[in-house]
């Protein structure tokens, strides 16, 4: 090939060399398990949500008198509209399932520890953006649960001292949830997924700066292989399993993860007997309800994300992986059970004994993050191949 041809070869362009560096030749620890495949699955979910959302937006009308009917129009009159809507609605649930598994894998293997603090913090920001995007998207069908969910959740901002009421009025675009609110939420719901794409790319770039963690939690530059083709083939197994799982919900149980009240048009004069958010918000909603005071509940929700953000900045551990930390391993499984219990409590009425159970579960949730720094230096089974320098500094990288 001549010098001129080399200069104009597409594969020689910077963008392709960057893609090759991050997606093809990226050096990956050879012992990664299937638990490391949820990052790529999250990317697939995000693409599905954006593509289906763009097509749904072509037929949706963001007006309080037309929104509910436009959704029914998509379901009944648009060719393939039912498939688009069910893919989008259930795709949100799949997205959160994948991301929750991704987060718990990070907690189990301490993927948040040095030198990947920035990777973890970006992940928490992405998680927060997902919650905001999903919430405002849930309002758009303008059913009963959409309307009253928007009313209850947005009114929580009034608990902020001094500026709370002003923020609520700004969110509503008036003095109640109405047409201005719906228009604002539709605009933001269209915009935020693209911000999520940018945040995800930053997350990926930050990860590749120091490389992926591994099940042993031991850093090594020697035992690595190229991402392609080995981990593409490995991830392909997860992609196929995910496609089957996703298809079951779309074609056999498309409304199970939703709420039947949302098939009733929004009525400001009739309050549902029990207002509950989507299932993936239930653990956080249970923590919110466990505090009787509104301001205290909002502070507890803020503390959830502060705890996640602060996790990487606790003192370093001798060993990352829970495989060598049996005490932490047991506490981790208790945390997982606690989060499932919070999810169940979140959909129960606000009455005894559910309130008490929610308060105990919320206390243990925060206790986990409080004792994690201590557990980082407690345990047995430190691998013998750790060097003396590792033991002195507490660093595994």
From Swiss-Prot:
Annotated signal sequence is: none
The portions of this protein that span the membrane are 38-58, 82-104, 119-139, 185-205, 231-251, 295-315, 327-347, 354-373
Give cofactor(s), names only.
Answer: heme b
InterPro entries the UniProt entry points to: Cyt_b/b6_C (IPR005798), Cyt_b/b6_C_sf (IPR036150), Cyt_b/b6_N (IPR005797), Cytb/b6-like_sf (IPR027387), Cytochrome_b (IPR030689), Cytochrome_b_C_euk/bac (IPR048260), Cytochrome_b_N_euk/bac (IPR048259), Di-haem_cyt_TM (IPR016174)
GO biological process assignments: mitochondrial electron transport, ubiquinol to cytochrome c
Q: Where is the protein situated, by its record's location annotation?
A: Mitochondrion inner membrane
Q: How is this protein positioned relative to the membrane?
A: Multi-pass membrane protein
Textual note on the cofactor: Binds 2 heme b groups non-covalently.
Summarize where a ubiquinone binds, as residue positions.
208
Q: Which SUPFAM superfamilies match?
A: a domain/subunit of cytochrome bc1 complex (Ubiquinol-cytochrome c reductase), Transmembrane di-heme cytochromes
Please tell me where heme b b562 binds in this chain.
Answer: 88, 189
UniProt cross-references to Pfam families, sorted A to Z: Cytochrom_B_C, Cytochrome_B
Q: Which CDD domains match?
A: cytochrome_b_C, Cytochrome_b_N
Q: Does the keyword Iron feature in the UniProt annotation?
A: yes
Record's GO cellular component terms: membrane; mitochondrial inner membrane; mitochondrion; respiratory chain complex III
MF terms from GO for this chain are: metal ion binding; ubiquinol-cytochrome-c reductase activity
Which residues take part in binding heme b b566? 102, 203
- Keywords for this protein: Electron transport, Heme, Iron, Membrane, Metal-binding, Mitochondrion, Mitochondrion inner membrane, Respiratory chain, Transmembrane, Transmembrane helix, Transport, Ubiquinone
Its biological function? Component of the ubiquinol-cytochrome c reductase complex (complex III or cytochrome b-c1 complex) that is part of the mitochondrial respiratory chain. The b-c1 complex mediates electron transfer from ubiquinol to cytochrome c. Contributes to the generation of a proton gradient across the mitochondrial membrane that is then used for ATP synthesis.
Tell me the protein family, please: Belongs to the cytochrome b family.
The record ties this protein, via PANTHER family, to: CYTOCHROME B (PTHR19271:SF16)
Share what the entry says about its subunit structure, partners included. The main subunits of complex b-c1 are: cytochrome b, cytochrome c1 and the Rieske protein.
Print the miscellaneous field.
Heme 1 (or BL or b562) is low-potential and absorbs at about 562 nm, and heme 2 (or BH or b566) is high-potential and absorbs at about 566 nm.
- Protein name in the entry: Cytochrome b
